[in-house]
Amino acid sequence: MTEQRTIASSATREDEAADASIRPKRLADYLGQQPVRDQMEIYIQAAKARGEAMDHVLIFGPPGLGKTTLSHVIANELGVSLRVTSGPVIEKAGDLAALLTNLQPHDVLFIDEIHRLSPVVEEVLYPAMEDFQIDIMIGDGPAARSIKIDLPPFTLIGATTRAGLLTAPLRDRFGIVQRLEFYSPQELTRIVIRSAAILGIDCTPDGAAEIARRARGTPRIANRLLRRVRDFAQVKAAGHIDLTVAQAAMQMLKVDPEGFDELDRRMLRTIVDHFDGGPVGVESLAASLSEERGTLEDVIEPYLIQQGFLIRTARGRMVTPKAYLHLGLKPPRDSAPAIGEPGDLF
């Protein structure tokens, strides 16, 4: 099993506690994702002008990009309360009914990991989203009867990292669909500078930029790296973070300039050394790395693919010339092209 990685995009308890203190409250403070911000500003203002609940919103994208944060910002901008839950927590239809019946008019209900809702719960959610009504079964056996309960108009915000796992009926009931993209190093630098200021960390712009460029395009990772570099600086540099201190801290953490850690490099080197650069099936690769298939597909691969170090083909995974060069190796003449180069397999 994979231990918690410093550059993992999944949230830890420390992340959740820290995020609460640095989470932006308004769209003006929500850095990056400019197209999403521009659209949501229009939808929010229009809903407020009409005095209506905003349409239901589906937010999807890799973990750590700010889906939960965006839901808080939306509720704050609408001036309503936010109720937060997740798909696995809502086990029965009654659990969902309890949440819905306690909402006030125009409130926002945020369901994280919405793709993990059970079919029974989804069936209750459909009329709630469309008609602001739910049907509840009272009693058992022949005496059971259905009672229709009216709900106040509300906005459902669903978040998922696996949009493809949503059922079509659920997906079609969202009037607003937003995809969050990986952040640029420049955007992450602004986020690191903002977080450092809020947390009272002495960090220079070049130190922030060094942290940002190793954060895999993900604010959650950038903020976590900032906290680890702060620890390093507190012991080794009197609490001051500059370029040199940030680089030394990253070397200690074994996070290279591309944002890769030992597991990323081990995966690339395994494909090169054991499978001649690929293609290799994901099951064989998982066995070689002693990792679960889901860990490879959901945790390790997305960033390697997005950065052009790895490609998926019908025959399996292949590394690109860029991966060979990163490992200090000379690419073979017949190695897979990097994403976007001539001969791209997609």
Curated annotation (Swiss-Prot):
Sequence segments annotated as region (Large ATPase domain (RuvB-L)): 1-183
GO molecular function, one term: ATP binding
Disordered as annotated region, ranges: 1-20
Chain positions recorded as Mg(2+) binding sites: 68
Residues annotated to bind ATP: 22-23, 64, 67-69, 130-132, 173, 183, 220
Record key words, sorted: ATP-binding, Cytoplasm, DNA damage, DNA recombination, DNA repair, DNA-binding, Hydrolase, Nucleotide-binding
EC numbers for this chain: 3.6.4.-
Annotated region described as Head domain (RuvB-H), given as residue ranges: 257-346
Catalytic activity: ATP + H2O = ADP + phosphate + H(+)
InterPro entries: AAA+_ATPase, AAA_lid_4, DNA_helicase_Holl-junc_RuvB, P-loop_NTPase, RuvB-like_N, RuvB_C, WH-like_DNA-bd_sf, WH_DNA-bd_sf
Annotated spans, Small ATPAse domain (RuvB-S): 184-254
Biased composition (Polar residues): 1-11
Residues that coordinate or bind DNA: 293, 312, 317
Pfam families given in the database record: AAA_lid_4, RuvB_C, RuvB_N
Complex and partners: Homohexamer. Forms an RuvA(8)-RuvB(12)-Holliday junction (HJ) complex. HJ DNA is sandwiched between 2 RuvA tetramers; dsDNA enters through RuvA and exits via RuvB. An RuvB hexamer assembles on each DNA strand where it exits the tetramer. Each RuvB hexamer is contacted by two RuvA subunits (via domain III) on 2 adjacent RuvB subunits; this complex drives branch migration. In the full resolvosome a probable DNA-RuvA(4)-RuvB(12)-RuvC(2) complex forms which resolves the HJ.
Protein name: Holliday junction branch migration complex subunit RuvB
